[in-house]
Amino acid sequence: MRILFIHQNFPGQFKHLAAALAKRGHEVKALAITPRAELPGVQVMKYAVPGKNGPSTHPWLLDLETKTIRAEHCARKLLELQRCGYTPDVVVGHPGWGETLLVKDVWPEAAFLAFLELFYREDSLFDPEFAVRSFEQAARIRMKNAAFLVTLDAMDWGLSPTSWQAAHFPPEHRERISVIFDGVDTAAVRPAKDAWIHLEKKQKRLSRENEVITFVNRNLEPYRGYHRFMRALPRILELRPNAEVVLVGGDGVSYGAPCPNGTWKETFLNEVKDRLDLSRVHFVGRVPYPLFLNLLQISSCHVYLTVPFVLSWSLIEAMSAGCVVVGSRTAPVMEVVEDGKNGLLVDFFDTDELTSRVVEVLSSRERFASLGLAARRTVEQHYALSKCLPKQLELVESMPKRRKTSPSTRAL
């Protein structure tokens, strides 16, 4: 079959899937704005988005206009391919940035599989500390979903990584959404007793012999519970005088609102730094993937906190590495972590409970080691690439049969 992937930063979530389809003999192409990697057997094409938002655009429509601009330029590239005689059998695309809005208008006969990562809800209201409820906010969120609603109407089938994510899409579309996780390479992300890292700034070498608390996010921000973790740290370090804390993440914002003054990282560090032994707190920023894996492999306790939002890959990777996870008792985490079985869960807002759980794990590492082993088994059984990739391949290869009998009217 001819299969076309569309992702602004290809390969993104499609790294293993696209390469595997090419290996199986399919003709695989990909379209991106800024490709991040080359894959064997996959022809990657680029397109440009020169347009920008107009000066008089209604603020509630800025997101939709941005996505429409991307959709236009992506569609023009698709039309160019069409004029050259190319028509895919299957299009697999991430609609989150708008590129796929007009796919079915260019190729109504192609089967369109949409990667459905997030349907916007008022998750910002979860944490009262940052909740700002207003009619304007609700209207903005509703309008942000406008592009997704167009995609849901046009797609032949959807793919979501978790049940929690799939359940957030409108009920009338859920029967056309398959839940298959992206997949973690458990052969690469695995426990390693001899792992170690070197912290250059403070000239420290850490291994599994040390008490190491890990906290990982793309950016250190409230959506991922950074403020809750920082407020627990002074007491944790007081009770565990030999513990070292390593925080991975940038200073920016991936989700939610930006910090009104400076960065969230500095704001919540400043709140507690007078009560911290900063010689044992290590902010390492964003790190190369091999170093990230080594860090997970030496972790004595991995803390993962999040509001009800898309689950981070890093949690599944931590479990695959055999970490003892202390996670927030929020729905996305509870889909993966079962309290007392393959990790520990705490109330997102309860600083004392978080503190006591982390201290308990560090105080009795041998007793809690079984949770890390169980976490690894959970990933091997349900989230491993070896389990997920065959299901993804089967879904893509079945897409011509899943095409809706009445494709949308061609508009271009």
Enumerate the language-model features and the residues they cover.
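Aromatic "clamp/platform" in nucleotide-sugar-dependent glycosyltransferases that forms part
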Residues: 307
